């Protein structure tokens, strides 16, 4: 195996007593060594003993080379085991007397583990798919030291005279391979001693020794009896070991057989040849006891092997060869030289057996009719006594099979990195793990890996399934299922293989009849368990087919037929009343009945079940069809509902899209409308603002017009007022015009007086208005009154000349003073009345010049004739004349004039030719003059600008 746990290689208490000189050493070629020898050599060197024969041979060759020996010639020990076995038996007796209890426990744990070893070794060496064990881990000691098979032969020879020793030997022999050479007397003794443990009647001896039996066995050759029986012998081994309370050596022998069991699959049919010679020498009692004792250990192995079949393997042939080779192990070591001689033939037969692998697994062939017929005859003679012997063992084995079958778990979907230790750690959370292995297909290394785990109880296995099925391990989803037992496939392939070798194996001993019966009982139990686990419709169909095949008659009875792919089997059982074999197809409830009822009642009930099974099969088929129809109907209904839902969803989505588009359009329309309304509102607001602005402007315009109208009205009022005041003095003025005092000659004098200061053109009198003549005289009187003493200070008339600068009149026409004076006079008059009137026209200039002359003339006439009131009246009278004046001496000119400082005087503060004297600063009624002061003492400081004005009148 891949891992050998500590202690597996120890000899144990039984071997401790062996003398060192017991074994004799011989030299054999490496290619001649069997797997068991290879493993023994590897174990001596503390090397790994796992793998098939080629791997072991390669490993051993490498080790031998490292030791410096010839790898082709290797020295191995050929043990002479007579003393060894004797000591072992004595030791076994002593230990039995001590009655140690832990043997049962160890057997328990070893039981499942041994099953696993056997089954997985078969798995490992499958002919079809070459399943190989990647990794394994086991709880109990898995293998025992290699004991020579010679010792098993010598045991009986040396101890058959003593019944006590024979009893002890019989307790231990079942653990050893069942083939031993015994003489007739020894056989009788062993039969007698076997009655200590089993109810074997003396008749069995006679029936077994009948010559008829020998003929039958010769006919049968080796067909399908010895190998399955040996296989079952391993299954029956453990309960018997417990019953007899055999301690250390006994257990070690069982482990040794396990080692053989695991080793022999590689050797295949090579060992069948030597088995025939061994069988000729072996005793029937030994075979019976070995069968009884080995049976339960193999049963779980069958389950394991069937569990491996899902990987696509064909374990049947390999299992059969494993079982047969298990039995042959001792005889081969006993007669190694004879074994080697027929080995080529054996290999040929092995190849032939492999050729039939597919047939064995896939169909139920009618080939073994001959063997089954002879086997039936064989059974007639031996069945009655054997049944009595086997029943207690069957019950015990039934319990063990029931418990052991459910303990094996098949784990699929493992990661390639998963090791057996990982599986063991994982499954040990939910119970005790007896053993765990990881297998894969050796031919395709990248293939999927599978795990095989054996728990201590089926309850723990169930718990593991419930907790670990469909869980994740190393990134992969694992499936945990109970392992299914399909032993019948193995039997079928055994039969085919045995038929191929019938000629070579014809010298089989009489003990086969006993083996056949026990084998059948074991097969029935295995089939019951298997039926419980996999009663499927396909199995039922196959079973029906098998039954049709079986019905023709008792000659066509096969011991066990199985559909390799389905797992339904038939069993041949001896009917006591008729003395002939009866074929029955088992159902799930058979195990309980077998333990409580007699054999004939069992066969009757089985026949009834055969009849019932057709109806049941039909019902099952009908139910299956009905379920299928219902499933299809439900599926159709679900599909229809799903399509309806999808249609509705599509329609709903379409309507939603349509509605959404409509809402979007409406939203756009509303948005456009809102924008239009907004634009209209803004337009309205703009128009409103415009209207208000126009309204304001209109109002302002109206106010302005109103103000102008008021101004005009006020001016008209003022004019009317002045005109109303003026007519009171107009008669005086008019009269004065005609006055004799206004002669032309007077003007000559005035002109003469002011000729330097007032040069005038000839047309100076053209625009003279005689109507206004009187006002100048009043004004002149007013001025003359206050300014006569100081001419330079009081010549007011000289200060009104600024107006003429404004309207651009030529300065040469008049004197500067007269221009300034009259302009200033008009401006001052306007200022005093608070009205901004346009400056006086040009005509006012002549009036001003003429007025000066009038003033001077009248000043001489009337000194101080007028008072201040007359001056104010003069202002009002002159207003009308100045109203028509226009020009630049308007508001700005008016604003620059000074105000009146005292009584009647006019201050000139505007812009003049020379120095500026502000009019506001004058006091005491004097009129400030800009350029008059120097003119009085010098009346003519400058030459007259116009010479033609210099003439005097």
Curated annotation (Swiss-Prot):
GO terms for cellular component: cytoplasm; extracellular exosome; intracellular membrane-bounded organelle; nuclear body; nucleoplasm; nucleus. The keyword DNA-binding applies. There is a cross-link at residues 65, 94, 188, 199, 380, 385, 388, 391, 395, 517, 524-525, 541-542, 551, 578, 586, 608, 616 (Glycyl lysine isopeptide (Lys-Gly) (interchain with G-Cter in SUMO2)). GO terms for biological process: regulation of androgen receptor signaling pathway; regulation of mRNA processing; regulation of transcription by RNA polymerase II; Sertoli cell differentiation. Residues 224-233, 292-308, 345-358, 383-400, 525-551, 567-579, 590-665, 684-820, 843-859 have a biased composition (Basic and acidic residues). It is found in: Cytoplasm; Nucleus. Residues 274-285, 370-382, 555-564 have a biased composition (Polar residues). Residues 600-953 are annotated as: Interaction with SAFB1. Residues 98-114 have a biased composition (Acidic residues). It comes from the Eukaryota. The keyword RNA-binding applies. The modification Phosphoserine is found at residues 54, 109, 158, 207, 507, 513, 787, 832, 886. Pfam families: RRM_1, SAP. Residues 881-890, 899-927 have a biased composition (Gly residues). This is Scaffold attachment factor B2.
């Amino acid at each position: 195996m891949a891992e050998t746990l500590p202690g597996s290689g120890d000899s144990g208490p039984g071997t401790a007593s062996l003398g060192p000189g017991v074994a004799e050493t011989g030299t054999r070629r490496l290619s001649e060594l069997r797997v068991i020898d290879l493993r023994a050599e590897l174990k001596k060197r503390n090397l790994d003993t796992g793998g098939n024969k080629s791997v072991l041979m390669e490993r051993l060759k490498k080790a031998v080379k490292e030791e410096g020996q010839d790898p082709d010639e290797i020295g191995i020990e050929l043990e002479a085991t007579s003393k060894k076995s004797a000591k072992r038996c004595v030791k076994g007796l002593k230990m039995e007397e001590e009655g140690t209890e832990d043997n049962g426990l160890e057997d328990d744990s070893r039981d499942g583990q041994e099953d696993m070893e056997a089954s997985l070794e078969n798995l490992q060496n499958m002919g079809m798919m070459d399943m190989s064990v990647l990794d394994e881990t086991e709880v109990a000691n898995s293998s025992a030291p290699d004991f020579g098979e010679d010792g098993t032969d010598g045991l009986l020879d040396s101890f058959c005279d003593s019944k006590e020793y024979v009893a002890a030997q019989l307790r231990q022999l079942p653990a050893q391979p069942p083939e031993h050479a015994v003489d007739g007397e020894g056989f009788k003794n062993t039969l007698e001693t076997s009655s200590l443990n089993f109810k074997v009647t003396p008749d069995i001896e006679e029936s077994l020794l009948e010559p008829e039996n020998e003929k039958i066995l010769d006919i049968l050759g080796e067909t399908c009896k010895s190998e399955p029986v040996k296989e079952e012998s391993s299954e029956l081994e453990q309960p018997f070991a417990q019953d007899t309370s055999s301690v250390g050596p006994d257990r070690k022998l069982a482990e040794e057989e396990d080692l053989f069991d695991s080793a022999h699959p590689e050797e295949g049919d090579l060992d069948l040849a030597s088995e025939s010679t061994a069988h000729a020498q072996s005793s029937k009692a030994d075979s019976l006891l070995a069968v009884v004792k080995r049976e339960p250990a193999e049963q779980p192995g069958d389950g394991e092997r069937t569990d491996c079949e899902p990987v696509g393997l064909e374990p049947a042939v390999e299992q059969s060869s494993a079982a047969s080779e298990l039995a042959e192990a001792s005889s081969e070591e006993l007669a190694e030289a004879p074994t080697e001689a027929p080995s080529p033939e054996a290999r040929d037969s092995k190849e032939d057996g492999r050729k039939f692998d597919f047939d064995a697994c896939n169909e139920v062939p009618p080939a073994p009719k001959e063997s089954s017929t002879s086997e039936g005859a064989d059974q007639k003679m031996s069945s009655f006594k054997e049944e009595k012997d086997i029943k207690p063992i069957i019950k015990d084995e039934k319990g063990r099979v029931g418990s052991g079958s459910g303990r094996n778990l098949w784990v699929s979907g493992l990661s390639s990195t998963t090791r057996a230790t990982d599986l063991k750690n994982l499954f040990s959370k939910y119970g005790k793990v007896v053993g765990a292995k990881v297998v894969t297909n050796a031919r395709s290394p990248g293939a999927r890996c599978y795990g095989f785990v054996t728990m201590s109880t089926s309850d723990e296995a169930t718990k593991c399934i419930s907790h670990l099925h469909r869980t994740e391990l190393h990134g992969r989803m694992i499936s945990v299922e109970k392992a299914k037992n399909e032993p019948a496939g193995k039997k079928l392939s055994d039969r085919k293989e045995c038929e191929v070798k019938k000629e070579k194996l014809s010298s089989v001993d009489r003990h086969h009849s006993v083996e056949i019966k026990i084998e059948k009982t074991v097969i029935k139990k295995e089939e019951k368990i298997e039926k419980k686990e996999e009663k499927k419709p396909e199995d039922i169909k196959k079973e029906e087919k098998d039954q049709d095949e079986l019905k023709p008659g008792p000659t066509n009875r096969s011991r066990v037929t199985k559909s390799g792919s389905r797992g339904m089997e038939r069993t041949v059982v001896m009917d006591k009343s008729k003395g002939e074999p009866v074929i029955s197809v088992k159902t799930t409830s058979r195990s309980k009945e077998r333990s409580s009822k007699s054999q004939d009642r069992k066969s009757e009930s089985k026949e009834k079940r055969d009849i019932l099974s057709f109806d049941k099969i039909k019902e099952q088929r009908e139910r299956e069809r009905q379920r299928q129809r219902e499933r299809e109907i439900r599926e159709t209904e679900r599909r229809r509902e799903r399509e309806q839902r999808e249609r509705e969803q599509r329609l709903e989505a379409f309507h939603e899209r349509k509605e959404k588009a409509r809402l979007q359009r409406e939203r756009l329309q509303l948005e456009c409308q809102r924008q239009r309304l907004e634009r209209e509102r803004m337009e309205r607001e703009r128009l409103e603002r415009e209207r208000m602005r126009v309204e304001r402007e209109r109002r302002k315009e109206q106010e302005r017009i109103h103000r102008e109208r008021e101004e005009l009205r006020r001016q008209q009022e003022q004019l009317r007022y002045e005109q109303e005041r003026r007519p009171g003095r107009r008669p005086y003025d008019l009269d004065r015009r005609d006055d004799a005092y206004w002669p032309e000659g007077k003007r000559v004098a005035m002109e003469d007086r002011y000729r330097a200061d007032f040069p005038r053109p000839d047309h100076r009198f053209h625009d003279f208005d005689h109507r206004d003549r009187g006002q100048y005289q009043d004004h002149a009187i007013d001025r003359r009154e206050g300014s006569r003493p100081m001419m330079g200070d009081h010549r007011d008339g000289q200060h009104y000349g600024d107006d003429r600068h404004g309207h651009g009149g030529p300065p040469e026409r008049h004197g500067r003073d007269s221009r300034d004076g009259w302009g200033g006079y008009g401006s001052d008059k306007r200022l005093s009345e608070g009205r901004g009137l346009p400056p006086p026209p040009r005509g006012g200039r002549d009036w001003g010049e003429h007025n000066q002359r009038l003033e001077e003339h009248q000043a001489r006439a009337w000194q101080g004739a007028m008072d201040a009131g007359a001056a104010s009246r003069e202002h009002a009278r002159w207003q009308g004349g100045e109203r028509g004046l226009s020009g630049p001496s308007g508001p700005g000119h008016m604003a620059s004039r000074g105000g009146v400082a005292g009584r009647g005087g006019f201050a000139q503060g505007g812009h003049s030719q020379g120095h500026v004297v502000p009019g506001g600063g004058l006091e005491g009624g004097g009129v400030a003059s800009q350029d008059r002061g120097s003119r009085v003492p010098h009346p003519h400081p400058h030459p007259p600008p116009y010479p033609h004005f210099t003439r005097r009148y």
